[in-house]
A protein has these predicted regions:
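Juxta-kinase regulatory segment immediately upstream of eukaryotic protein kinase catalytic domains
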Residues: 1-26
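ATP-binding glycine-rich phosphate-binding loop
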Residues: 22-44
Length: 350
């Protein structure tokens, strides 16, 4: 397995052998699903529908960090919160084959949520309030915290050292990145010492699947959905309609508002209305410190910097140039400079 191309050895034969190694009989059906950081596949299981296999990027997370994520999702499922948890085989959710670590999940269907519907926003608020009420019960030991260093300073430094910035744009990008990070720091200072808890971490519409409510238990699971080994805990996601959370791979410690701001869109007035409807549901289960609202544009800025550095760090993975061909273009970095300037203005207004 090459460190530069970490998935070069992850062939279909290896994938099938890995899944069969935990005791499942694959029927040969194999479909790659959209994922770049990890590799995710849907596999057919004889007489049991489908299972989803996530192969973790080598070197990103320690075993302890992955197991903490799995344990958090298991807490949510135990509280009947609709989250898709990894399946356990022989008491373990993290498996290894041929140098690759992987987890298996039941397949969860659904459509994107309609966040322009006030009732949907309130429902999402109630669900995230329940998730955060569980998340605050303990802290991660092996997973990182969302902070300015990890999501801002380090990405800024990496990009400047990467030689991917066009030389003629580097001075302008460096200057506005530094201004943006100064504004982020001021926003965090103004917000004060807000509480950190275990988060989903990447809470946007792509990681929420909406299913229709079902009239009774016997219709709760669509056909061809693998629900796990005999005797295993059934995912709450398999038994109810509404929103279901998937992909806790970016879960970390951070302020509650990190799991909220990506759900809102439109102009400032529209987002304020959406936010209030969301909080109407959220605060039925969890209190919310309004000081965290000062962090929204700061967190958006950190996400912009982190996103560019994420692609840069993965540029040697052949999947990334194919998926993001515009990344090393002049136009991309010009747009980044303009976005950061806009963010500086928004943070100064706030």
């Amino acid at each position: 397995m090459s460190s530069r191309h970490p998935y070069a050895g992850l062939t279909p034969d290896v994938i099938l052998a890995a899944v069969e190694g935990v005791g499942l009989a694959c029927d040969g059906r194999l479909l790659a699903l959209g994922s770049y950081e990890n590799r995710v596949y849907q596999l057919g299981v004889e007489d049991q529908g489908f299972v989803v296999a996530k192969f973790y990027r080598p070197g990103r997370w320690s075993d302890a960090a992955i197991e903490e994520e799995h344990a958090f999702v298991a807490e949510l499922v135990a509280a009947e919160i609709p989250a898709v948890a990894p399946l356990a085989f022989a008491g373990r959710t993290l498996n290894e084959y041929g140098g690759y670590r992987f987890a298996l999940y039941p397949r969860q269907g659904g459509r994107p949520p309609e966040f322009d519907d006030p009732a949907t926003l309130e429902w999402m608020g109630r669900l995230l309030g329940r998730i955060h009420a569980i998340g605050r019960r303990s802290v991660y030991q092996a997973r990182p915290t969302l902070d300015i260093v990890a999501f801002g300073r380090k990405p800024r430094d990496y990009l400047l050292e990467s030689n991917l910035l066009p030389p003629d744009l580097e001075p302008a990008w460096r200057a506005i990145a530094d201004q943006a990070l100064d504004a982020v720091r001021r926003s965090f200072d103004l917000a004060g010492d807000v509480r950190h808890l275990r988060l989903h971490g990447d809470c946007h519409a792509g990681n929420v699947l909406w299913t229709e409510e079902v009239p009774d238990e016997k219709h709760a699971s669509p056909p061809q959905v693998f629900l796990g080994p005999p005797g295993g805990r059934r995912s709450a996601a398999a038994a109810s309609g509404g929103p279901h959370f998937v992909d806790f791979d970016d879960s970390r410690m951070g302020p509650a508002v990190q799991d909220m701001w990506m759900l809102f869109s439109g102009d400032a007035d529209a987002m304020a209305r959406q936010r209030q409807r969301f909080l109407d549901g959220y605060e039925q289960f969890m209190d919310f410190d309004r000081r965290e609202l000062r962090l929204i544009e700061a967190l958006r800025t950190l996400r912009l910097l982190h996103y560019s550095a994420w692609i840069a760090r993965r540029w040697d993975d052949p999947a990334f140039p194919a998926a993001f061909p515009w990344f090393n273009s002049q136009r991309y970095w010009q747009d980044c400079i303009l976005e950061l300037r806009e963010q500086v203005g928004l943070m100064q207004e706030g």
